């Protein structure tokens, strides 16, 4: 086995190389990463190496040998697959690692994200929904010093940026969202999809699933005439009555 292949071969199902393949297959079946769209990157906390899904691979068929491995310090590739080129998302993933101290980033072409990008302006908003409690607030508990989640009564806000011809051209707008929304763990790209990050791949997965649930709920609320961020008890003021 070559020194490069040692980086991606492990019997541990939680090894980044194995986990990226497992999750990409799952996300394909969720209809989030079809037609080679989307991608995942995970930082190995033991080695400080970035594991990155390549460009142009069918996500349900991806294997560890398809992955790129990059040194987090030098940003040099330690391993490159023969059949694929680096994802155009790579600069965006690196920005999340460097500016948000992310441990993993998930990019999907979720239809819910695309539809919400058409329904909302500069930001996605939803309030007073239980699932919001799965999303980090960006604040720290003064007593426990642990990160705090949003509460049921909070409004989740996710910035929406405009799509570009190439994904690496999104980098300037991504940096701007980091400044304008310092507590966000996601950004929606209009008519494209969503990027979600977290301190670990487990957290990023939870955030992504919760946000997708909330976006789907927001779409259904819009269909009923209910603003997703309306106050508690105000729903019936907006509700579209079904035809008899």
Swiss-Prot record:
Pathway: Amino-acid biosynthesis; L-methionine biosynthesis via salvage pathway; L-methionine from S-methyl-5-thio-alpha-D-ribose 1-phosphate: step 2/6. Its EC number is 4.2.1.109. Pfam families: Aldolase_II. One of its GO terms (cellular component) is cytosol. It catalyses: 5-(methylsulfanyl)-D-ribulose 1-phosphate = 5-methylsulfanyl-2,3-dioxopentyl phosphate + H2O. Binds 1 zinc ion per subunit. The active site is at residue 130. Its cofactor is Zn(2+). Substrate binds at residue 89. One of its GO terms (biological process) is L-methionine salvage from methylthioadenosine. It is an enzyme of class 4 (lyase). Keywords: Amino-acid biosynthesis, Cytoplasm, Lyase, Metal-binding, Methionine biosynthesis, Zinc. Its main location: cytoplasm. The keyword Cytoplasm applies. It is found in: Cytoplasm. Zn(2+) binds at residues 107, 109, 192. GO terms for molecular function: methylthioribulose 1-phosphate dehydratase activity; zinc ion binding. Gene3D superfamilies: Class II aldolase/adducin N-terminal domain (3.40.225.10). Belongs to the aldolase class II family. MtnB subfamily. Catalyzes the dehydration of methylthioribulose-1-phosphate (MTRu-1-P) into 2,3-diketo-5-methylthiopentyl-1-phosphate (DK-MTP-1-P). Present with 952 molecules/cell in log phase SD medium. HAMAP family: Salvage_MtnB_euk. This is Methylthioribulose-1-phosphate dehydratase. The gene is MDE1.
